[in-house]
């Protein structure tokens, strides 16, 4: 079992000035989710997701999102994707490895911790 989140309600990390760092989409294992209190589950869960996706928007800075990805990885994320629809790239961040950048992939398949998850991306580049 898993707990998956959109940006409306998800896992996050305490961040500067009382703010919460939260990705556009995330995944947390059921075991970790159930270890939280009801109060923690009712708002931004104070934990780092095992898998997350950030999507660059027109109002975002790529450098700031790349720094945010480094924060996620330093805090225990196992896999993270940074999707840049303007540059037509997806940067794959894995624990203990340098990011791998894919140019205009038709799809991307995740490994652990979400083995079997596949995202079709070809429509992003059209």
Label each region the model flagged.
Residues 2-3, 11-75, 79-126:
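C-terminal interaction segment
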């Amino acid at each position: 079992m898993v707990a998956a989140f959109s940006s409306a309600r998800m896992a996050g990390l305490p961040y500067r000035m009382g703010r919460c760092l939260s990705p556009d989409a995330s995944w947390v294992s059921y075991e970790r989710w159930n270890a939280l209190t009801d109060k923690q589950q009712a708002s931004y869960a104070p934990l780092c997701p095992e898998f997350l996706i950030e999507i660059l928007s027109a109002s975002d800075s790529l450098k700031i999102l790349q720094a945010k990805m480094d924060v996620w990885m330093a805090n225990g994320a196992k896999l993270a994707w940074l999707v840049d629809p303007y540059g037509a790239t997806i940067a794959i961040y894995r624990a203990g490895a340098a990011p791998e950048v894919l140019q205009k992939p038709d799809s991307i398949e995740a490994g652990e911790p979400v083995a079997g998850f596949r995202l079709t991306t070809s429509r992003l580049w059209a």
